[in-house]
């Protein structure tokens, strides 16, 4: 059975890490931690029991991390699932992430505590699901004179982050002197360095992880249909391709940034709309022992610097409003912005020639249609699910919570 947690109860959340990791017998089968959580919930037990005698034909549109997770969760309940994508799995937004499986420490400052807590629980699930494609990394906040956030404030934030993780914590928060940081990062500018704070989080090995997800989907019986553009959705369970109409018991719109646009093209009313935010990253030739979280001077934004291997780091991300009809690329201005922030912290600035490559993706920020757009940096990355007869649409979400979202949608089928 697939593993997303719909909602772990208090008893399970308060159990020790060892207790939770213990494999248990459920109805004469061996269950993982997430299966135990699923079966511990009586509502889910009833839904799963009903699904065993009510197999449905399901179409999932969009093979990003949300679509793959939803398809896998549905197939694990015995449904016949076809997963359609205009290109190939993980070809768009899901391929352009910051390579982190995390609670989102910056969301604490914005007040999205529930989202952070949920994602931290799910982070543990990723470590168990793909131990060979995930790793724990320590992230350091260097603090300079004049920084928007002082080291004690940052340390307090990391402690809250660790506390929210509870028994799912992957390492302690730490307060650092300037000498500590100079030792770990000798390339940092020493003048004005006041010390900092650090915390632990999880980084994905992208290619092995997406292969693990695709393999799991196929193992559960999902039929993946690549290079198939879906032109139109219907509330009665039909979908139109370029040359035929297919009928299903349920259709799940998991088209990510294009979910709302697909509904509009299908003349299906929705109470939600999507704001599109482009996030760009650089892969830079540089060497760091651990990850850095840099405060953008004069802003409240933060930039991650994550080691990929001994010679390269991932630098990102930007946040720019994006017209979904425009090409999704990292602009020259974004490249210069990211490199400048890194260079403002280095004794020996990097030249533009150190940029090995760049990539960009568009994140869908969901909001009710009758509300005005807000600040994109503080907007929630939470998800919304909308049901219109046999059509289920999924808006928003983030990598870390995708398997949790998959379970929620599967329970609604």
Predicted feature locations:
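Core beta-strand elements of the Rossmann-like FAD/NAD(P) dinucleotide-binding domain
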Residues: 242-250
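Extreme N-terminal leader/targeting segments of oxidoreductases
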Residues: 31-58, 73-76
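C-terminal catalytic lobe of FAD-dependent flavoproteins
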Residues: 272-276, 288, 296-311, 321-413
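Flavin (primarily FAD) binding-site architecture
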Residues: 253-268
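N-terminal Rossmann-like FAD-binding beta1-loop-alpha1 element of flavoenzymes
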Residues: 57-82
């Amino acid at each position: 059975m697939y593993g997303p947690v719909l909602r772990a109860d208090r008893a399970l959340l308060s159990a020790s890490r060892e207790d939770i990791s213990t494999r248990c017998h459920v109805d004469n089968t061996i269950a993982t931690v997430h299966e135990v959580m699923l079966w511990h919930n009586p509502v889910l037990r009833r839904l799963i029991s009903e699904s065993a005698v009510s197999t449905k034909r399901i179409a999932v549109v969009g093979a990003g991390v949300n679509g793959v997770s939803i398809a896998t969760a549905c197939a694990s309940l015995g449904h016949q699932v076809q997963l359609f994508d205009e290109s190939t799995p993980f070809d768009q937004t899901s391929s352009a992430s910051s390579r982190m499986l995390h609670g989102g420490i910056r969301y604490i400052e914005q007040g999205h505590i529930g989202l952070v807590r949920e994602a931290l629980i799910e982070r543990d699930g990723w470590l168990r699901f793909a131990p060979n494609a995930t790793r724990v990394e320590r992230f350091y906040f260097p603090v300079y004179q004049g920084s928007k956030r002082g080291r004690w404030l940052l340390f307090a934030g990391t402690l809250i982050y660790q506390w929210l993780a509870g028994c799912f914590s992957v390492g302690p928060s730490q307060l650092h002197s300037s000498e500590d940081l100079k030792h770990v990062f000798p390339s940092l500018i020493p003048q004005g360095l006041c010390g900092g704070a650090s915390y632990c989080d999880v980084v994905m090995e992208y290619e092995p992880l997406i292969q693990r997800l695709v393999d799991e989907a196929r193992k559960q019986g999902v039929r993946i249909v690549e290079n198939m553009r879906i032109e139109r959705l219907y509330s009665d369970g039909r979908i139109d391709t370029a040359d035929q109409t297919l009928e299903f018991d349920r259709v799940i719109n998991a088209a990510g940034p294009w979910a709302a646009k697909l509904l509009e093209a299908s003349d299906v009313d929705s109470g939600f709309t999507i704001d599109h935010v482009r996030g760009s990253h650089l892969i830079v030739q540089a060497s760091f022992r651990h990850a850095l979280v840099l405060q953008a001077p004069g802003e409240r934004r933060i930039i991650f610097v994550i080691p990929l291997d001994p010679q390269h780091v991932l630098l990102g991300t930007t946040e720019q409003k994006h017209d979904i009809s425009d090409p999704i690329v990292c602009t020259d201005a974004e490249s210069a912005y990211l490199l400048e922030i890194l260079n403002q912290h280095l004794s020996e600035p990097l030249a533009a020639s150190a940029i090995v490559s760049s990539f960009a993706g568009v994140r869908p920020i969901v909001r009710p249609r009758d509300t005005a757009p807000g600040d994109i940096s503080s907007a929630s990355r939470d998800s919304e699910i909308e049901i219109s007869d046999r059509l289920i649409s999924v808006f928003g979400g983030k990598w870390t919570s995708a398997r949790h979202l998959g379970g929620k949608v599967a329970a609604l089928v």
